Amino acid sequence: MPLFSRPAKKATHLFFATDVHGSERTFRKFINAGKFYKADVIVMGGDIIGKMAIPIIREADGHYRATLQGTQQHIETEAELDKLTERIGILGFYSKIMDEDEYRALAADESAVDAMFHELARARLESWLELAETRLAGTGIKCYITGGNDDYPDVLEALNKSGTESVLACESKVIDIDGQHTMASLGASTPTPWNTPREVTDEELGSMIEALVEQVDDPSRCIFNFHDPPVDSTLDTCPMLDWTTDPPSQIVKAGQVVLYGAGSKSVRQAIETHQPLLGLHGHIHESPGIMKIGRTVCANPGSEYAEGILHGVLVNLADGKVQSYQLTSG
C-alpha cells in the first residue's frame, strides 16, 4: 500500500520594519523591500510620523532661510531649496515655505503650530499610502501598517481609507494574513519621558492586549505585533534617563551610562502566557535583536531612520512554525 503524507503548506515570507518616524527615504525603502526580499507580507510596526516641522522663510529678496539641527541655512537657488527639503524629508521632519508675516503669526500661536504639524503629517502619510498602492499594485504583496506611541490618532485616521487593495490598516485588530496565520496589532506604549500621544500605564496596556487576544482562535498561529517590546528581553535595552531634566538626560554611574530594560511587563506576560508564534516589536531603536520567550520568537529590528537606513527582519512562516528568520539592513 502506498504511503501518503500531507502536502507541505506554502511558506509565507514576511518582512517587518518599524519606527521610520516620517523619513521619506526609509519608508520608500520599506515599500521596495517587499519585492527585493520576495515577501508576501510587509508590516510597518508603528511610529510612522515625524517629530517636527521646519519653517522655511521666504525673504524679501527671493532667498530663503531655515534652521535645521541648530544650524541656520541660507538658500539662494531653487536647486538649493530642493536639496534642503529633500534633506529635511530624509531626517523625518516636515517643511513648509512661508513669508515673514506668516512665520511671526505662527510663532505667536501654539495651536496654529500644532494644526500645521498635524496637517503636514497627515499629508505625508497620505502620500505614502498612495505610493505604496502604486508600487505594490499587481504584486500580490500585502502591506499592513499600524501606529506607535508617537503617532497622533487623527493622523492615523488616514490609514482607514477605504478602497485600498495592497495597504491595509491593522491597528487594534486581529487579521488573517495568509490563511494559516493571524496577526494581532497594538501601537500604544507604556509611559516615556516625552509624554507622547499614545501612552498608557502598563496595566492598561495589559488590558488592551487581553481584550485583543480574546479574538484570537489559536495563539500558537498568531503574530503579536506589539510596538512595545517585552521587558528585560534584550530587545528593550536603552540608557536610563533622568525625567526631571529638560530634555531628559542619561544617568551616569562610575563613569558609565546606566542601561536598563524599558519594555513592558504586560507584553512579556502576554507572550509568556499565550506563547504566540512570533512577536514583532520596536520602540527602542538602539536595541535590535532576536530572542525567544518560551517557544515564541521575538524580534526588534531597531531603527536608524534619520540616516535613511532601513533595518528589518525577514521571517519565513509555514503551518504554525517559524522556519527561519534574519535581521536585515540597507
Across the structure, where does each feature detected by a protein language model lie?
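Divalent metal-coordination and catalytic microenvironments
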Residues: D19, F27, I42, D47, ...
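Binuclear metal-dependent hydrolase catalytic cores centered on His/Asp/Glu-rich metal-binding motifs
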Residues: G179-I223, D242-W243, Y260-G263
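Active-site-proximal beta-strand elements of phosphoester/diester hydrolases
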Residues: A11-H21, Q180-T192, I223-H227, V297-S303, ...
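Core catalytic region of metal-dependent phosphoesterases/phosphodiesterases
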Residues: P2, T26-D178
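Active-site environment of divalent metal-dependent phosphoester hydrolases
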Residues: H21-R25, I49-A53, I145-E157, D176, ...
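Active-site-proximal segments of metal-dependent phosphoesterases and phosphodiesterases across multiple
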Residues: S111-A123, N225-Q275
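Binuclear metal-dependent phosphoesterase catalytic core
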Residues: P2-F4, G22, V174-Q180, T196, ...
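Proline-centered loop/turn at the N-terminus of a beta-strand
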Residues: K142-Y144, L168, T182, R221-I223, ...
